[in-house]
Amino acid sequence: MSETIPKKPLKKGSLVFVDKNIYDKSIEALASDSDLPAYIFEGPGEILGIKEEYAQVRWRRPVPDVWFKLDQLKEYLASE
């Protein structure tokens, strides 16, 4: 009997990073600068709020907050 752990939905306060493969195939990637900073793909960023299918993410750097589609974000798991 194989049981899978259900995926936790992302919510306010979740630590995340951007999945580069999913982002590169998105319509948002076509409309944005192709030279994005590495820190968004490495994480962690913190979700400040969610509206419909978008999340506002704050990075631990002195940069503006950014909105990403929820399906482009993955939960950040700190490695020990």
Swiss-Prot record:
Localization per record: Cellular thylakoid membrane
Record carries keyword Nucleus: no
EC number: 7.1.1.-
Pfam families recorded: NdhO (PF11910)
One GO cellular component term noted in the UniProt record for this chain: plasma membrane-derived thylakoid membrane
Keywords, alphabetical: Membrane, NAD, NADP, Plastoquinone, Quinone, Thylakoid, Translocase, Transport
Single GO term (MF): quinone binding
Protein topology in the membrane: Peripheral membrane protein
UniProt record similarity statement: Belongs to the complex I NdhO subunit family.
Subunit structure: NDH-1 can be composed of about 15 different subunits; different subcomplexes with different compositions have been identified which probably have different functions.
Role according to the record: NDH-1 shuttles electrons from an unknown electron donor, via FMN and iron-sulfur (Fe-S) centers, to quinones in the respiratory and/or the photosynthetic chain. The immediate electron acceptor for the enzyme in this species is believed to be plastoquinone. Couples the redox reaction to proton translocation, and thus conserves the redox energy in a proton gradient. Cyanobacterial NDH-1 also plays a role in inorganic carbon-concentration.
Name used for this protein in its record: NAD(P)H-quinone oxidoreductase subunit O
Lineage: Bacteria, Bacillati, Cyanobacteriota, Cyanophyceae, Synechococcales
